[in-house]
Amino acid sequence: MRVLVIGGGTGGLALAHGLRRAGIDVSVYERDALRTDGLHGYRVGIDPDGSRALHALLPTELYDTFVATKARDSKYFNMLTEDLKELLSLELLESTDPVESEKSISRMTLRQVLLTGLDGIVEFGKEFTRFEQHADHVTAYFADGTSATGDLLVAADGSGSRVRRQYLPQAKTEETGIVAIAGKLPITAESAKLVPPKVFEGISLINAPRGFGCIVHVMEFQWDHDGNVKDGIGGNTEELIRRWPGLQFDNTRDYINWGLSAAKDKLPANIMELRGADLIKTALDVTPGWHPNLRRLFELTDPGTCFPVNIWTSVPIDPWESSNVTLLGDAIHTMTPGRGVGANTALRDAVNLCRKLIDVRDGKQELVPAVHEYEARMIEYGFDAVLKSRAQMTSADPVHKPGIGRLALAGLRTAMRTVNHLPPAKRRMRDQMMTFRGADRDELTLDITPAPQP
């Protein structure tokens, strides 16, 4: 059996590791020309679902490297006003378990971790154009005139998936009406003092009038500005980082990143055309009454890291007839960052698909029925996450409406302040948040064994 994976993102690369360990022939085709291409330097939160999936799919030492290269753990989940007054702060549970825990990692770091050990499997500079299906094989064609043939083609090519457009033209994505401006700045003596201690040690959401919001993450890593392991980092972590070849491709250093979001009609009409300094100026223009420290964060941002994001979401569709083409991650269930589970859902897909393909390898199932079982489960939890994420991030939310928006914001703030003074309610809220992020789910264990010898 040969598997063709279109797209070298989180889900596709994780799947490739699992298949490789299972002795299944797999190739990944990535359109970027180099492993360092693309703007991958922002945070991704890996929840217990994602951690279990990576633990199941990656070789043991590579998973340990993933844990060693994550950012410092967040201690708090904070909700604040635009003048940095606390509305709600949840103390997150500390966990020393390398699997059953939340992790923050730079997207570039995660990319380099997942590319480790896949030399000869990932082909760069491969822009997918189309596929052809036949009874016993499928062929992918690329813009450079080459092609590849296998038994199964997996679309892991993101929200703009060309595979999906050809295979499931009825599967659409739509705008949420929300646009974000993203940027990051290095942690310095000045920038570190601009945020309160809980913000520096946590994940923070700012709820402001007119539906404006801003997320702030502080990311500190185990290596310094020169890429050397920091003093005081010893033991296995130090050894793993020193041995990891991916660090030479990783430009990640300690940073603060932020994402300012609002309904599209609250931002300049040409927001998606702006870049760099123009986006920083826009962020400052639309936040005149915000705390000076937040505005200073915007001013200190590296213009080269700033870009606009038009938030899209999938429209759930009915099940389709399964075949030798399937999909995972954003290619089928693009979701807003409202719940922070997009990458984790892609990893969940990768484990479940890998499990089914191992069954095919072992003769327990035929290929198409195995794909069907994977898709039936994936559609259920994937589109559920899409809908719940969209509910958290849409211009249809009352907070974006004139008049009623003020009342909605006032009600939201009152509710958060009330909960903030009720420790049992805070614990329930924290536990509910963690349950949604997979804290109590056990389906993502997978014991990958090599193919039995004939």
Language model: regions and residue ranges:
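Conserved FAD/dinucleotide-binding core of flavoprotein oxidoreductases
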Residues: K85-S106, A182-D302
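Short, solvent-exposed loop/turn segments at secondary-structure junctions
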Residues: T10-G11, A22, A33-L34, R52, ...
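Conserved N-terminal glycine-rich FAD pyrophosphate-binding loop of Rossmann-like flavoproteins
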Residues: A33-A53
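Conserved mid-domain beta->alpha element of the FAD-binding
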Residues: V5-D25, Y29-D32, V154-A155, I181, ...
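C-terminal helical "tail/cap" subdomain of flavin- and related membrane-associated enzymes
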Residues: T65-F66, Y76, E82-L90, R296, ...
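A short beta-to-alpha transition loop/helix N-cap that caps and shapes the active-site region
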Residues: R35-L39, T176, E190-S191
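Conserved N-terminal helical subregion
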Residues: M1, G18, D47-P186, P268-A269, ...
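Short, flexible hinge/linker loops that cap or flank conserved catalytic cores
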Residues: S147, F249, D318-W320
